[in-house]
Amino acid sequence: AAGNNPSGASRQLPLHKGALGFLQTRKEYIMNKLWAGRSEAETSALADAFNSSIAVDGRMYQQDITGSMAHAAMLAKCGILTQADADQIIGGLAGILADLQSGALQLDMQAEDIHMFVEAELTSRIGDVGKKLHTARSRNDQVALDLRLYLKDEIAALQSLVLAVISSLHAQASAHKDTIMPGYTHLQRAQPITFGQQLLAYAMMLERDYGRLADAGRRMDASPIGCCALAGTTYPTDRVFEAQKLGFSAICENSLDGVSDRDFCVELMSACALIMMHLSRLSEELILWSSWEFQFIELDSGFTTGSSIMPQKKNPDMAELCRGKTGRVYGDLIALLTTLKGLPLAYNKDMQEDKEAVFDCVDTTKLCLQIMAPMLASMKAKPENMLLAAQKGFINATDLADYLTKKGVPFRSAYKISGQLVAYCIAHDTVLEQLPLETYKTYSDVFEDDLYIEISLKTCVARRISAGGTGPASVQAQLDSVAAFLAAHQ
């Protein structure tokens, strides 16, 4: 079916000749162009191909047909169509939808767009009654409706995928809430933390991403249908009835705004860009951690590849692709922003370019989320290597300074003494834990035997008792918070 296209690529569906013979030839198609009012001249084949968008917007066939069914019902309710005509139209549309979903009917790549295809197919099936469907609407509000309906469904799909990644992160974080590793700043070993807390940081980033998707969905939840081309309609329509029938909570209150803005696309794409930024940062760490230089984790073979020439390689290609595809999503967002920035109200044909950008953006984000959840779930941590790394780099130096401060030494003085001791250790190829007490006392008389407990990595982690910190109680609170979020949204 045209609606299933996870890759985001424009899919060339087989040419449909029409069971009842419509659009048999290009000439007949031109003669039956539904917008051919003023002009009788034929457009060139090149212009027709250039103007066509069905290869992109064809995926919205279900939304287009659903919207048309609701429109026919509204026209009948308001007395603009007879109930008999509306029933015939709705029945014809239901048949088209069923045939598209089953594969009995395929999109015609010679059609200009999905709206023209559906209307022409409807007319071919039920005759002139089908020509009444477009009363009191324009393709301008029709495409805005289709896009909102389609993207509302995509938001729900994205949210489900975000939850799956959060769940994988939570499971790994729970298993490694006490696994000590070095925390980094500037990619330099900084302070001891737990692997669980590191993973929970990404879980909480994605929680906010989930919320941004929800926010985008709330602002998208207004129906543009009935705005017509730009100024509304002279017919006594009921836009609220039609909106409610389609599951919207409100209508676009200004007809110009309803047909001419795509900020709902931009907002969703911005949320996708942030999701991808977070996935990219996580991917970068997975790439680093799985390297021989770190050896903190091992990615499952199902999410890595080998080399065509180097037999020892296990390449983190899936993580690298998530990182690489982030730039693609950014490009989609910038492309649509650039398209919209200079457009006067109301509709302009430039806006046909919105769908390729937003579809690719959403498709790519979904694909990366789909790969990330199982890749994280199957990841194997190497706690022993994390601990070895934490034992190097003097990441307990801050705790040494804190020890002195708690003994009454001003922090800046304590900071200086701690730095001098680190320099001494480097010069003598040793570590803080192995320096004799006599050496410590040459720097300050306040040092006692208790300092060795204070600068042990386990103590360093346990003493981080502040809310949000890496201490056991704090990490457990973070785990509980993420678990509550998952329970509330799954």
Which residues does each PLM region occupy?
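Intrinsic disorder/low-complexity segments
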Residues: 1-30
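Short, conserved catalytic/metal-binding motifs centered on acidic residues
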Residues: 18, 141, 282
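A helix-coil-helix interface module used to build multimeric assemblies
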Residues: 31-232, 237-243, 305-306, 321, ...
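Glycine-rich cofactor/substrate-binding loops
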Residues: 32-63, 67, 128-129, 310-490
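Generic, well-ordered alpha-helical scaffold segments in large soluble proteins
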Residues: 71, 92, 96-99, 121, ...
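Alpha-helical support elements that line or immediately flank enzyme active sites
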Residues: 151-162, 272-277, 281, 405
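Charged, flexible cofactor/metal-binding loops and thiol motifs
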Residues: 174, 182, 188-342, 349, ...
